[in-house]
Amino acid sequence: MDLTAPLADTIAAIATAVVPEQGSIGIVRLSGSRALAIAQAIFTPARRNAVWESHRLLYGWIHDEKGRRLDEALAVWMQAPRSYTREDVVELHCHGGIMVVQATLQQCLRQGARLAQPGEFSLRAFLNGRIDLTQAESVADLVAARSPQAAQMALAGLQGKLGQSIRALRQELLGLLAEIEARLDFEEDLPPLDVPAWQARLQDIQAQMQALLATAERGQLLRTGVKVAIVGRPNVGKSSLLNAWSGQDRAIVTDLPGTTRDVVESQLVVRGIPVQLLDTAGIRATDDPVERLGVERSQRLAQTADVLVLVIDAQAGWTEADAAIYASIRHRPLILVINKTDLAPADKIRLPPEIAYRVPAVAAQGQGIPELEEALEQLVTQGRPQPNLEVSLNQRQAAALRQAQASLEQVVQAMQAQLPLDFWTIDLRGALHALGQITGEEISEAVLDQIFSRFCIGK
């Protein structure tokens, strides 16, 4: 994102998703000092004496510069500072066809608006003090959320709960810094620093930081999810497992080996974790060129998945083909599903002892899915109890908080070494700077560019 783009420009963009499956409504958004003038140039209210009032919808028509009508629409003006960007904002609510929405946007540009860059509306909201940086990042997280838990976590961030926690820590550190600096400036007028009490407050701040850091791993998991590939030799029930797990008939199931020749994908949520579930072609040697391509693709996919689910047939037991597949993936996070246990018991099969996660199943009947989901959660969380998150740190925020922690550890070492108070202030300021990077009070243009460039246009 180009942060040198003039903030005085009035910007415009399509604010709703542009997808092949057209929605019923499409919104074009304007922000800037000329937003209202541009809207008035291309939108005529149906009622002749209608007055543009802030936060009131107007019904009318969008037209081109020659007065030719383009769409029947609604318009709403949000007068600064009572808008998302704290600038004048106008939204034009059109019918959802892409041609209509694009034509409306083009009229805005012809009247002098500049096409907004990705994230520029949210950047202006941040620069104008409407939101802090944690809230801006939560906007992107809310748009990208793939599970109810991720959406709730992003919403809490958007409401400012993470920013409030960070600012509270900052205020406490500022209080500690003020006590030291007062004694540096007015040493003769103040009693000596109560070091044990001061240190206890510092330890409390460190504990609060650690509690926030504990949310980062789970938060990242809820945001990004995991890719799970179902692998195994042909006809062991991989497609039946995908269908049972996803609750949909996504894959063709037959008694013929080699039916699945391409990767079949399904999206689901497992205990709050977004999962991209992939059913792959059965891995075996084959003379069929089409099936061989599917096998090769399955092998490549197995190397990129976060978790592999290896399916075997309880009737056949642990075969040489199973052992060969396992040998190629044994270094990866793995769950073994022993399928068709209604036909043969799983406990009679001799399996490699190092496979920790084993799930008996009858995929065709949907049996074993809860146990499989429990194994997946245990595997990706490494068995650690997972907090019920209200807010969580993303990777950037966690890195900054670790930097703040490291600075406070330097303060502790300075205290233990009985260094002068001046040395304490250096690292306290370092911790304050790191916390300011989280909320955006102290942030570089390069970091802002990195953050807002991942937004979609119109946000």
Swiss-Prot record:
What Gene Ontology terms for biological process does this UniProt record contain? tRNA methylation; tRNA wobble uridine modification
Which Pfam families does the entry mention? MMR_HSR1 (PF01926), MnmE_helical (PF12631), TrmE_N (PF10396)
Sequence ranges assigned to domain TrmE-type G in this UniProt record: 225-381
Q: What class of enzyme is it?
A: hydrolase
Q: Where, in this chain's numbering, is K(+) bound?
A: N235, T254, L256, T259
Q: What's the record's note on cofactor binding?
A: Binds 1 potassium ion per subunit.
- Main location group: cytoplasm
- GO CC terms: cytosol
The Swiss-Prot or TrEMBL record lists the needed cofactor(s) as:
K(+)
Q: Which InterPro entries match?
A: G_TrmE (IPR031168), GTP-bd (IPR006073), GTP-bd_TrmE_N (IPR018948), GTPase_MnmE (IPR004520), MnmE_dom2 (IPR027368), MnmE_helical (IPR025867), P-loop_NTPase (IPR027417), Small_GTP-bd (IPR005225)
Q: Which UniProt keywords apply?
A: Cytoplasm, GTP-binding, Hydrolase, Magnesium, Metal-binding, Nucleotide-binding, Potassium, tRNA processing
Xref: CDD domains = trmE, TrmE_N
GO molecular function annotation:
GTP binding; GTPase activity; metal ion binding
Q: What is its EC number?
A: 3.6.-.-
Report the locations given in the UniProt record. Cytoplasm
Q: Does the keyword ATP-binding apply?
A: no
Name the positions where Mg(2+) binds: S239, T260
Tell me which residues bind (6S)-5-formyl-5,6,7,8-tetrahydrofolate: R29, E91, R130, K459
Family, per entry = Belongs to the TRAFAC class TrmE-Era-EngA-EngB-Septin-like GTPase superfamily. TrmE GTPase family.
Question: What does the subunit section of this Swiss-Prot or TrEMBL entry state?
Answer: Homodimer. Heterotetramer of two MnmE and two MnmG subunits.
What is the role of this chain?
Exhibits a very high intrinsic GTPase hydrolysis rate. Involved in the addition of a carboxymethylaminomethyl (cmnm) group at the wobble position (U34) of certain tRNAs, forming tRNA-cmnm(5)s(2)U34.
> This chain belongs to which protein, by name?
tRNA modification GTPase MnmE
* Taxonomic source organism: Synechococcus sp. (strain JA-3-3Ab)
